[in-house]
From Swiss-Prot:
Species name: Rhodococcus opacus (strain B4)
Source taxon at top rank: Bacteria
Keyword terms: Cytoplasm, Ribosome biogenesis
Gene Ontology cellular component annotations, sorted alphabetically: cytosol
Function: Required for maturation of 30S ribosomal subunits.
Family per similarity comment: Belongs to the RimP family.
Record gene name: rimP
Family matches, as Gene3D superfamilies: RimP-like superfamily, N-terminal
Lineage: Bacteria, Bacillati, Actinomycetota, Actinomycetes, Mycobacteriales
Main location as per UniProt: cytoplasm
Record GO biological process: ribosomal small subunit assembly; translation
Keyword Transport tagged: no
Name this polypeptide is given: Ribosome maturation factor RimP
Amino acid sequence: MPVPSKERVTELISDLVQRQGYDVEDVAVTLAGKHSAVRIMVDSDAGLELDAVANLSHEISEVFDSVSDFGESPYTLEVTSPGIDRPLTHERHWRRARGRKARIDLAHETVVGRIGALDGDSVAVVIGSRTGPDVRRIALADIQKAVVQVEFSKPDPRELELAGGIPEGRVAPADADASEDEEVVEGLDK
């Protein structure tokens, strides 16, 4: 019996993940002959800690074991946080990325700036210049694609101040980028 669909996996885990205070960001089911992989990306406003991801992985594994959807087919379960290269597609992504630098593609221009406060249907973006940083509001509907950028040096304190700082529980940009950009718990082969 094959591994269940992405939709079925999402249905099986959504309540559990939400009760633990996380959002299901994505589910990927990869069929590879007799052995398959189920990759689940989760996130929260406070970020993820490795121990919490490990516990969540074990609880998800128990849910999978309690249903017949997986049959006897072996699979690898991987629970991870979204990487830094995840596009910002939901309001919660923008909220969680406040204080981070992002590349924002609009219809006729590309803007690189520090993400500020989300206000209804627009986001504040702090754009650095020779004369100092300036804040520009951009309608979410006008954004074609936005991706957080890797930063290797500490952000300008004035830019961070104008952006509203770093959300509570999140790591400052250069500190986060210096470490791994994903936490992964692997090795739960069934």
